[in-house]
Design a protein with these regions (language model features):
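Terminal helix/beta-alpha structural elements that buttress the NAD(P)+-binding lobe
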Residues: 1-152
Length: 152
């Protein structure tokens, strides 16, 4: 599970939400440590089919999997997404909310304290010296789990 998904699970739990974290089958063990109430393999259609009505879905990835989740959102439920309203949401009784990053120093400070206290973590994929930035950029472009850190 990537950094955005980890943060979404963490923040949702802080607000008292019943959290179902959607990950690839290969990531289920790792996701269990995040404290979600349920882990759902998004690459397993039978697991998706087992879903009941959902009050809301937060799509932090933007892949085609959202199409299979939309039918499970209850009438007048919420779809929060990073990529705008998907076509599959047209004609459905749900509210689509576009998620945009907003700088907020107080929230970032709170997360920083939680990281320092060991209550929240983001995996580090690899550290590079600043002088080796030419190697970091292609790795970042490929995507993957964990953050790439540049150090002086």
């Amino acid at each position: 599970m990537g950094g955005v998904g980890r943060t979404a699970v963490h923040v949702a739990r802080q607000h008292g939400a019943h959290v179902i974290a959607g990950v690839r089958s290969s990531q289920k063990k790792e996701a269990e440590a995040l404290g979600a109430d349920r882990i759902l393999a998004l690459d397993n259609q039978s697991e998706i089919a087992s879903l009941k009505e959902l009050d809301a879905v937060a799509d932090t990835v933007g892949h085609e999997v959202i199409v299979s989740l939309i039918p499970h959102i209850k009438k007048n439920g919420v779809l929060a997404t990073v990529l705008g309203k998907p076509e599959a949401a047209n004609g459905r009784d749900l509210r689509v909310v576009e998620i945009w990053a907003q700088p907020d120093s107080s929230r970032l400070e709170k997360l920083a304290h939680e990281v320092a206290a060991g209550k929240f973590s983001i995996p580090i994929r690899r550290e590079f010296k600043l002088s080796d930035i030419r190697y970091a950029d292609p790795m970042a472009e490929k995507g993957g789990i964990g953050k790439i850190i540049l150090v002086a």
